[in-house]
Swiss-Prot record:
This is Chorismate synthase. Its cofactor is FMNH2. Its EC number is 4.2.3.5. FMN binds at R125, S126, S127, N238, A239, G278, K293, P294, T295, S296, S297, R319. The gene is aroC.
Length: 361
């Protein structure tokens, strides 16, 4: 199976399945001499970890990460960093009924069409369980970006179903289980989640991720534009069906005089572009949004077929998230960090000596 690696200089390769013995990843390209411990990675893993609230799957995985290589005496050595997380709470028997049945809306049908077989236990490689390793690798990138460049990456839920969430206070994001920046909407979110659990249904969501302190100049035209790589990274997250950079699809209703980010001696006057112009960072906040579909793992009966092509009724068993967008917030942060880390290393390799006299803000 190809397609398990992202990045050019900062490269992350993940492996493992939902109900396998463990998940792991290899992180290449980390500069030497960076202080790094397992505790540095654990914080974000705990934010993504299942079973931490009544609103997410009750699969209880400690997600304790182990650093296997690439760190000596508490600092990175410049060699490959190996990371491992053991699976401890698999209930594979929950999936025995779908061994020969294709769950609608899942990768069961397409995986078997491609490979001629599939791991039906929790979706195998197609499960979002794999994203734990992205978060671990992304934590390395977030640490480097923050300490060396002052770059801060943060994300939040900005819509669940038909409930829009305004970014009122970033401090609120870590104070509630929804990663919600709008405290006034917490009761509405709770009511929606309770209704979904009662109905056995699910709902979609929108997640916003932002990076501040990013220097101007990151991005490689034309096929490795920074926004293209960010979109690629976010679209690779399970259940993501759409990505917007900056104003995104809202630009359709705008005129050029409204959308252009005018510049004065004090700097840019707006940021409709999301901090990227011509595929290269402008020095403004980088802003991206992603839409996540409602999970198909629901107890509402639905039609599908078995491997013999016979129509059957399907009710999903197991432990699942009514809204996968909630735990996607730290995953989105990780993927943005991985892309920015890669582009910073690439920019430094080619353009470290470039000096310009034009203003920076």
């Amino acid at each position: 199976m190809a397609g398990n690696t992202i990045g050019q200089l900062f490269r992350v390769t993940t492996f493992g399945e939902s109900h396998g013995l463990a998940l792991g990843c290899i992180v290449d390209g980390v500069p030497p001499g960076i202080p790094l411990t397992e505790a540095d990675l654990q914080h974000d893993l705990d934010r993504r970890r299942p079973g931490t609230s009544r609103y997410t799957t009750q699969r209880r995985e400690p997600d304790q990460v182990k650093i296997l290589s690439g760190v000596f005496d508490g600092v990175t050595t410049g060699t490959s960093i190996g990371l491992l997380i053991e699976n401890t709470d698999q209930r594979s028997q929950d999936y025995s009924a779908i061994k020969d049945v294709f769950r609608p809306g899942h990768a069961d049908y397409t995986y078997e069409q491609k490979y001629g077989l599939r791991d039906y236990r929790g979706g195998g490689r197609s499960s979002a369980r794999e994203t734990a390793m992205r978060v671990a690798a992304g934590a390395i990138a977030k640490k480097y970006l923050a300490e060396k460049f002052g770059i801060e990456i943060r994300g939040c839920l900005t819509q669940m179903g038909d409930i829009p969430l305004e970014i009122k206070d970033w401090r609120q994001v870590e104070l509630n289980p929804f990663f919600c920046p709008d405290a006034d909407k917490l009761d509405a979110l709770d009511e929606l989640m309770r209704a979904l659990k009662k109905e056995g249904d699910s709902i979609g969501a929108k997640v916003t991720v932002m990076a501040s302190g990013v220097p101007a100049g990151l991005g490689e035209p034309v096929f490795d534009r920074l926004d293209a790589d960010i979109a690629h990274a976010l679209m690779s997250i399970n259940a993501v069906k759409g990505v917007e950079i900056g104003e995104g699809f809202n630009v359709v209703a705008l005129r050029g005089s409204q959308n252009r980010d005018e510049i004065t001696a004090q700097g840019f006057q707006s940021n409709h572009a999301g901090g990227i112009l011509g595929g290269i960072s402008s020095g403004q906040h980088i802003v991206a949004h992603m839409a996540l579909k409602p999970t198909s793992s629901i107890t509402v009966p639905g039609r599908t077929i078995n491997r013999a092509g016979e129509e059957v009724e399907m009710i999903t068993k197991g432990r699942h998230d009514p809204c996968v967008g909630i735990r996607a917030v730290p995953i989105a942060e990780a993927m943005l960090a991985i892309v920015l880390m890669d582009h910073l290393l690439r920019h430094r390799a080619q353009n470290a000596d470039v000096k310009t006299e034009i203003p920076r803000w």
